[in-house]
Amino acid sequence: MKAIIIIAGSEFVQGRKQDKNGLFIAKNLFERGVDVQGIIISPDSHYELLNYIKFALDRADLVFISGGLGPTTDDNTRMAVSEAIGVPLIYNEEWLNKLKTYYKSNNVEITEERKSMAKIPYGSAIIENPVGRAVGFIKVLDDIKKAVVALPGVPSEMEPMFYKALEMLNINEKKRYTKLFRVFGIKELDLNYLLNDMKDLSYNFSPKGIDVFLYDTTLESFKEKEKKIKDRLGTFIYAEDNLEMEEVVGKLLRENKKTVATAESSTGGLIVSRLVNVPGSSGYVLGGIVSYVNEVKINLLKVNEEDIKNFGAVSEPVAKQMVEGVRNLINSDLAVSDTGIAGPTGESPNKPLGLHYIGFTDGKETKVYKEIYQGSRNDVRLYISQFALNLIRLYLISNS
């Protein structure tokens, strides 16, 4: 069985927002033995959506559409599906009554636009929305043995409705077992050496490390491979499935009742920004200093001016004094620092682009690590932030 996923939203086409629904739908379909032929990102335009739906129906058995079911003028999914399959839109009376009850109880007028969220193509089955107002639907095209599934774009609404759609389509049974291992601190060649005897693996490389994707069609074989990967990679695995490094570090900081502070130069606050992205981070993040210029390093972090003159701002002594300075200033349990050359300029004969020194201290011992990572400016900064967060993780798992 083949599927094509259509994500409706001009915000994705214009690069203002990153889609995650397509990945969620694709992963779950893959696990159930459905081969996804592609993910199409469409603007909100009725014309474009219509053409993409026709394109998908020509090539796939299942067409999943996420987004475009709201009450505004740019929500065109219902009409586009209706036109693509040649049936009119009708009100689902059950859902319309629920909308009327909801808006009446909230003293909100039930306008024609709001009523439109109860419209579905004739002959469709509704997928009730447990969270929001827009109803989803499945339209089975018996004559060509295909189906169109329309879901909202809000992930908290889409995900439970997607699982309900799978039940309604009778494709809920898992036929493939999958697992994502997120890995950091090991080189690509070393990883390949450790896992080169294993099939059914795929890799994705980024400044945040390596994602190792395992899949298998039998549970016994899957479990065997899963154990091998864990045994061979050990603490290089920082997360399983889609957790980010900052989420893992945040959990460890909470569990170990530790606080952290940062002193950043090259990363420009990215380390502390990632830490505070996690809800509840105020319980363990005390603060951060962006010491981008030498004066801030000297005046706030008490870095020795002579050391900057003798060794340069990008040096081991400076990284060491930065991390110790911020810990003393903010009075945290742990601290990390970075100083480096993110590029694309700033290199010298002895200091190449990408050179960084990353400091870590727990107040008893301070260590400084030298790293060279070359890429775009933002890729370098992202890698260094990941490296610094990983230092916190490794310390906490070895001192728990």
Swiss-Prot record:
Q: Could you tell me which CDD domains the record lists for this protein?
A: cinA
| Protein family according to the UniProt entry | Belongs to the CinA family.
Instruction: Name it.
Output: CinA-like protein
Species of origin reads Sulfurihydrogenibium sp. (strain YO3AOP1)
